[in-house]
Amino acid sequence: MTNIISMTTMCADVFVESGKMLAGGEALNFAANACKFPDVKVSIIGAIGDDDCGREVLRSIEGKPVDISDIHIIKGGKTASNHIYLTEKGDRYFMENSWDGGVDETFSMSESDRKAVCGSDIVYMTCYCNSYKDVVSLKDRSDFKLAVDFDVRRDFDEIEKLLPDIDFFFISGSEDILPVFEKWSEKYDCIFNVTLAENGSVTYHKGRKHSCKAVPVSEVIDTTGCGDSYHAAFLCSYAAEGDIQKAMACGSASASETLSHIGGFEY
C-alpha cells in the first residue's frame, strides 16, 4: 500500500458563465483522482472554512476512499475560491481578481500534520504551497518522496535551486522548454515530466527521454484539473510498477477523462 498525501489547496471553483460551483483545488483534484487506484491510501492536508464552500468540498469526496482526518475546518473561516472563465474551446482562463485564498493562504502545518508527512511514501504539492519549505525541512528525518507541480513557472534559475529536494517534477509548457529538463535529468536524480496539452507529454530521467501521445477526446468541455488528474495517475501508476512509460499512458488517459466534464473530477 502506497501512502500518498496531497497538499494543500481545496477551494470552490466558480464557473462564471454558467454560475455553477464545484469543489476543486489542486490537493482535492489530485486526491479525488488518486483514490481510484488500488493499493493507494490517499489523504489531504489543508484547511477549509465552515462555510458553504467548505461543506461542498467535504460533500464532493463523501463515499470516496480519501482520508480527511487532516483537513482543518476553521470556525468562521472562508474557504478559498477561484472564479473560472472558459473559452469556446473549453480552455480555462482567469481574471486578476479570480482567486481568493481564504484560509488556505494562512494555513500552517500542525505537529500532527508533520508526523503524517513523515509517515507517508509520497507528498504531492504545488510550488506555490505555503507549507512547501516546512515539508522540505522534514525530508531530513524521513524518506518520503516529494512530488511538486511547477505549473507554468519559467524562472528556471530559481527553480533549479530547489531540485535537490524534489523526486518528481511536473510542469506544463511547450516543446521549447524541453532542453532544460533534458539537461537537468543528467544532473539531478529526479523524474522530470512536462505536459504539452494536445501534444502529449515528455518525461526525462537520467538523460533518457520518454514520450507519450495525448489521448484524443471528441470534445473538450473543460481543462480545469487536467494536470492534477494526470499527475495523480502518473504517480499512482509509477508507485505500483516503477514504469515511466506506463505511468505517462495512465496519466494521459486520466487527463482525457477529465477533459470530458466540467471541473477537476466528477461527484
Residue ranges and their predicted role:
Residues 1-5, 60-63, 68-73, 86-210, ...:
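Ribokinase/PfkB-type carbohydrate-kinase core domain
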Residues 3-4, 15-82, 88-89:
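Substrate-binding N-lobe of the ribokinase-like
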Residues 9-10, 229:
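Active-site metal-binding loops of divalent metal-dependent hydrolases
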Residues 10-17, 65, 209-218:
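Glycine/charged-rich beta-loop-alpha catalytic/anionic-binding loops adjacent to active sites
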Residues 38, 142, 238:
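Active-site catalytic pocket residues across diverse enzymes, especially alpha/beta-hydrolases
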Residues 38-42, 91, 241-243, 267:
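Short helix-capping/linker segments at secondary-structure and domain boundaries
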Residues 182-267:
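Conserved phosphate-binding/catalytic region of the ribokinase-like
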